[in-house]
Curated annotation (Swiss-Prot):
The active site is at D242. ATP binds at I117, G118, G119, G120, D121, I122, G123, T124, V125, K145. CDD domains: STKc_phototropin_like. It is an enzyme of class 2 (transferase). The lineage of its organism: Eukaryota, Viridiplantae, Streptophyta, Embryophyta, Tracheophyta. Plants overexpressing PID show variety of development abnormalities, such as delay of adventitious root development, curled growth of shoots and agravitropism. The gene is PID. Serine/threonine-protein kinase involved in the regulation of auxin signaling. May control polar auxin transport and probably plays a role in the pattern formation and organogenesis in the rice shoot. Its EC number is 2.7.11.1. This is Protein kinase PINOID. It comes from Oryza sativa subsp. japonica. Residues 445-484 are annotated as: Disordered. Residues 472-484 have a biased composition (Low complexity).
């Protein structure tokens, strides 16, 4: 993964031509799936094999740029003010300044591509910066996802690409991507500008841990942030359907960002407040043998100790028969070919937590077919001698076991969603409301004892040390499938 932003060599910038587009299209078709916005594909060897900057450039004439901006699907300039949790971010302020000084919505003329940093099933990701920010002033860096509509159309995945951009426009959460701008570079290329995450992804970070697994406090921290992101998505009626460590990126401040929404399912939700009710005789007006003054004291004590109402928001009519996901993380109802709903995210969350703690997924087989059989038939088992048997470890195993119930109706989270998961004793030591202000286990670029970076410091000049080598899973372990 790219842990640092090095000063790029000035590439040769060329115009987009039909021949160049065709070469880029063929290159996009062969891009390995499941790469993140800060993928290891940005290593020197990968760049040598695919010099994408020789094929894709935004150095167009002013008239062409204005024409492209006029046909852009970028939101109007006023929409850049609708991100309250990013109000103090330097990267967002730079976007806002560029938008207000431009006569047209942000478009291809406003960005300069630096290098290719990754690729996915429906697009290629580039490191980029605003042209209005001089290089000598350490400009803010962004990740631009470029989708070749012709290549995606050949794969019959145009609907997925459109759904992902539609979801990105709705999101406003500290642990989810911010869509800074979206526009068309040419009639065939659609671009989305998002935050660049210099810390890589959780899969690569796990492989740098001792024994290739996270200590329990670190796993709890990352799982809690992912939990809050899923809670927000479900509140918006979005079933994620692609949770795995490769899709959890590390921001400059060490907090996470969930990414890749092309497999997500949109539905409706009905938020409500759910709380336990008192069923004592005295609460219901029944007779009691206690004196009145003792009853008044008991009622006051119960009122103080009574649990607060919990916010519940789960997609209410999200049902799909699509066979989508990554083999090791799909729920039994998906593996068996049945219909599924929001409960698939809680199954994947259990697999995700299992992998963070134990260094592997619980049902992996020698082949993808064996993995799917294990998911449907094999009971959950925990590795022996994998750690302590203290209360914290017992809580982790209990939470995982409840999340990995093969019956979706019995699965933790299937009834009250994240409210049930958040109340589990595993998260008792965390203040989830203040999680964003907590120091993450790993802060990119910060040494021992260093103060945590603020998210806006992704705009600072990064050290020029090369990124550490990463270990990736076998191709069949992370390959996604989508049979409709």
């Amino acid at each position: 993964m790219v842990a640092a932003v090095r000063a790029p060599v000035k590439p040769e910038m060329v115009e987009l031509s039909p021949a160049a587009m065709e070469r880029y299209s063929s290159d996009a078709d062969t891009t390995a799936p499941n790469s993140s916005l800060s993928s290891a594909a940005s290593s020197t060897g990968s760049l040598a094999r695919c010099s994408s900057l020789s094929r894709l450039s935004f150095d167009c004439s002013p008239s062409a740029a204005v024409a492209a901006a006029a046909t852009s699907c970028s939101p109007p300039r006023a929409s850049v003010l609708l991100r309250p949790h990013r109000s103090g971010d330097v990267a967002w302020a730079a976007i806002r300044a560029a938008s207000t000084t431009s006569a047209a919505p942000l478009g291809p003329r406003d960005f300069k591509l630096v290098r290719r940093i990754g690729g996915g099933d429906i697009g290629t990701v580039y490191l980029c910066r605003l042209r209005s920010s001089p290089e000598r002033e350490s400009p803010c860096m962004y990740a631009m996802k470029v989708v070749d509509r012709r290549a995606v159309a050949r794969k019959q995945k145009l609907g997925r690409a459109a759904a992902e951009k539609r979801i990105l426009r709705q999101l406003d959460h500290p642990f989810l991507p911010t869509l800074f701008a979206d526009f068309d570079a040419t009639p065939h290329f659609s671009c989305a500008v998002m935050e660049f995450c210099p810390g890589g992804d959780l899969h690569s970070l796990r492989h740098r841990m001792p024994s290739r697994r996270f200590p329990l406090p670190s796993a709890r921290f990352y799982a809690a942030e992912v939990l809050l992101a899923i809670e927000y998505l479900h509140m918006m009626g979005i079933v994620y359907r692609d949770l795995k460590p490769e899709n959890v990126l590390i921001r400059a401040d060490g907090h996470i960002m969930l990414t890749d929404f092309d497999l997500s399912l949109q539905s409706t939700t009905s938020p409500s407040l759910d709380g336990d009710t008192d069923t004592d005789d005295e609460a219901s007006g029944g007779a009691s043998c206690f004196p009145d003054h003792l009853l008044r004291f008991k009622r006051r004590r119960n009122a103080v100790a009574a649990p607060r109402p919990r916010f519940v928001a789960e997609p209410v009519d999200a049902r799909s028969c699509s066979f989508v996901g990554t083999h090791e993380y799909v729920a039994p109802e998906v593996a068996s070919g049945g219909a599924h709903g929001a409960a698939v995210d809680w199954w994947a969350y259990g697999v995700f937590l299992y992998e963070l703690i134990y260094g592997r997924t619980p049902f992996a087989g020698a082949t993808n077919e064996a993995t799917l059989r294990n998911i449907v038939r094999r009971p959950l088992a925990f590795p022996s001698g994998s750690g302590s048997c203290g209360p914290a470890d017992a809580d982790a195993r209990d939470l995982i076991a409840r999340l990995l119930a093969k019956d979706p109706a019995a699965r933790l989270g299937s009834r009250r969603g994240a409210a049930d998961v958040k109340s589990h004793p595993f998260f008792k030591s965390l203040n989830l409301a203040l999680l964003r202000s907590s120091r993450p286990p790993v802060v990119p670029g910060a040494g021992a004892g260093a103060a945590p970076l603020h998210r806006s410091q992704s705009c600072k000049a990064a050290p020029t040390t090369p990124p550490p080598p990463t270990t990736t899973k076998p191709a069949n372990a992370t390959a996604r499938f989508d049979l409709f």
